[in-house]
Amino acid sequence: SEMCIRDSYYFGLYKDNYFIFGPPIGNKPTKDNTNIKFQISIAQKLTKSTLPWGTYLYLYYTQKVFWNVLQNSMPMTDLNFNPGIGLNKPLFVKNRFVGSLSLQIEHESNGRDGDESRSWNKISFGGSIMVDPQFVVFGKYWIPIIDGVNNKDILKYCGIYQFGWQVHSVNRKFATSITLVKRQGWNLNYNVILEAAYRFSTKSNQYLFAQFY
């Protein structure tokens, strides 16, 4: 209900938090191309009372890391930092939560400076709708703000919008999703992310998780 959203925890999860391990598909696995990828993502609700249009102000932070644990010294070869701040509006139908809309200002960076710096900012508009308790559709579009001569082609990799859907089993123990990220250009060049998760117990919030990207 709306009261539950208003009184919910100030600190919680945002995107999926996961650890995965594996090599790229189509190449022979080696210690150089087999790594751990993990993501940590949190959200901090900054307002208890509702703002105009029934929104709440949130602070977001997501960090993604590629960790070559099979190499000597186990280097972390690619780090991605993604802080943001924005408004979130929960959506209700007959006092039942059915989704949300969001407006965010985000920064994304590899945390380096000089010629190795890869960073950009964006204003993003997102939303998710629960079509029924087992099926959710979602999407996000962003206006990029790119600085630096080394970042001009970043939209060819990070894209300009994304959409997808997620399906849950009736008992909530199995879930699968697909996300399509449209890269820059007029052709049908999409990054595809497939995910599947199996919940060991309905009393647990831990999942066996697999991702193809």
Q: Where do the language-model regions lie?
A:
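Residues that define the transmembrane beta-barrel architecture of outer-membrane proteins
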Residues: T34-I40, T55, T77-P83, G99, ...
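Short, small-residue-biased leader/transition segments that mark boundaries at the very start
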Residues: E2-I5
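Residues on the lipid-exposed face of transmembrane beta-strands in outer-membrane beta-barrel proteins
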Residues: I40-Q44, P83-K89, I105, F125-V131, ...
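Membrane-embedded beta-strand positions of outer-membrane beta-barrel proteins
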Residues: L57-Y61, I85, L101-I105, V137-Y141, ...
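Sequence/structural signature of outer-membrane beta-barrel proteins
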Residues: K64-N72, P90-F92, Q104-G114, W142-N150, ...
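Short loop/turn motifs that connect adjacent beta-strands in outer-membrane beta-barrel proteins
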Residues: T47-L57, L91-S100, V131-V136, H168-T176, ...
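Detector for outer-membrane/organellar transmembrane beta-barrel domains
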Residues: S109-R183
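Accessory, usually C-terminal, subdomains that scaffold auxiliary metal cofactors
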Residues: G159-Y213
